[in-house]
A protein has these predicted regions:
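Glycine-rich phosphate-binding loop of actin/hexokinase-like ATP-binding domains
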Residues: 153-257
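Catalytic phosphate/nucleotide-handling subdomain of diverse soluble enzymes
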Residues: 221, 226-262, 268, 332-363
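Internal helix-turn-beta structural module
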Residues: 301, 305-321, 326-329, 335-400
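Glycine-rich beta-strand-to-loop/alpha-helix junction loops that act as flexible
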Residues: 9, 92-96, 211, 325, ...
């Protein structure tokens, strides 16, 4: 069964085409549409076993972008399917499912209405995610669609961990609580990591660290999310590329009063101008921070130390919550590729039973590999995440 997986952003569409069977999957193509709504848009199409294809032209909206993707998939030279009739279902990544969606589901009018109702608490992501669904309805009418939510895996978090100590009326009226994100990735790498380490996913204590430009740490107890570092929005928790992470709210209101900043301006400052970018005024990319660190830049040294320390802090917190830990997993763009970060975070965790193996860690990038010594009580691994495969799998299981 050929499944199209879409991840629609405000000005981009990431996609993969995967041929799914009960016990196997085969990637046929992947690509990205960028600069939607700008004067010059881009399509980069990468079919497996064929030459990549690029297109540069105005792409006014998501519907136009998806049409270009479908044209590329059936192109005689660069395509991977003979006809669009081969596409049996489309799976969508949706950032926020609120309390409505504890698992993936087939798209209905009710599902679309609930995604729309969450626009105000996920204004950067949900509108674009829904636009992808509506665009497919226009260009592939009748094809079944499935939504897979970043928040679903975290719906198992108990109230003691998801509630904020605010007046309860705000939860009743607005559902203000911790939701958590990156759930699709956390669940996938925990399952793969448990298998790699010979652990029972449903009878284990796993801490997953999804570290990229955005990042979160999750405590997984007996196969279910028990706590996670992101909160009501993806702003909370770790120091990130441009996001501040955990901070005293009074510091923000103080800055707002002193600078005469609106709520919108404060929100932009915390989400777009903070993190390692704000600390260094150099970059939001940890590779640039690493170079500045090596050159002795004091602000880069502070930023990287804070970045690593916050990850370690959540690992310690979640080990305490679960009464110990059996495995720590690193994933995401930084988690999969930064040997320095993994070693720095694990150094000092010997008291928890972590015995890190620097030799195994060296050069381990984008692979699934155990990074702890054979006699380490706590297993450590890097696992390459594959959210698109999870979306395709959920889609296949719901529509087959």
């Amino acid at each position: 069964m050929v499944i199209l997986v879409l991840n629609c952003g405000s000005s981009s569409i990431k996609y993969q085409v995967i041929d799914m069977e009960d016990a196997s999957s085969k990637l046929l193509a992947k690509g990205i549409v960028e600069r939607i709504g700008l004067p010059e848009g881009d399509l980069t199409h990468k079919p497996v076993g064929k030459e990549p294809f690029e297109l540069h032209q105005p792409i006014p909206d998501h519907t136009t972008g998806i049409k270009l993707v479908l044209d590329a998939l059936t192109d005689p030279a660069h395509g991977v399917i003979a006809s669009l009739d081969e596409v049996k279902a489309v799976g969508h990544r949706v950032a926020h499912g609120g309390e409505f969606f504890p698992e993936s589901c087939i798209v209905t009018e009710d599902v679309k209405a609930k995604i729309r109702s969450l626009f105000e608490i996920a204004p950067l992501h949900n509108p674009a995610n829904l636009e992808g669904v509506l665009s497919i309805e226009k260009v592939l009418p009748g094809v079944k669609q499935v939504t897979v939510f970043d928040t679903s895996f975290h719906q198992s978090i108990p109230a003691v961990n998801y509630m904020y100590a605010l007046p309860h009326a705000y939860y009743e009226k607005y559902r203000v609580r911790k939701y958590g994100f990156h759930g699709t990735s956390h669940k996938y790498v925990a399952k793969v990591g448990a298998e790699l380490a010979g652990l029972d996913f449903h009878n284990s204590r796993i801490i997953t660290c999804h570290i990229g430009n955005g990042g979160s740490v999750t405590a997984i107890l007996n196969g279910k999310s028990y706590d996670t570092s992101m909160g009501f929005s993806p702003l909370d928790g770790l120091v990130m590329g441009t996001r501040c992470g955990q901070v005293d709210a009074s510091a923000i209101t103080f800055i707002g009063e002193k600078e005469g900043m609106s709520y919108a301006e404060l929100n932009t400052m915390m989400n777009k101008k903070s993190g390692v970018q704000g600390l260094t005024d150099i970059s939001s990319d940890m590779r640039d921070i690493d170079r500045a660190y090596d050159e002795g830049n004091p602000r880069a040294i502070l930023a990287r130390d804070m970045y690593y320390a916050r990850i370690k802090k959540f690992i310690g917190e979640y080990a305490a919550e679960m009464g110990g830990v059996d495995m720590i997993i690193f994933t995401g763009g930084v988690g999969e590729n930064s040997c320095e970060m993994r070693e720095a975070v694990c150094t000092g965790l010997e008291f928890m039973g972590v015995k890190f193996d620097p030799a195994a860690n060296k050069g381990a990038r984008g692979v699934n590999k155990i990074l702890s010594a054979a006699d380490s009580k706590v297993k450590v691994a890097t696992i390459a995440t594959n959210e698109e495969l999870v979306i395709a799998t959920d889609t296949y299981n719901l529509v087959k």
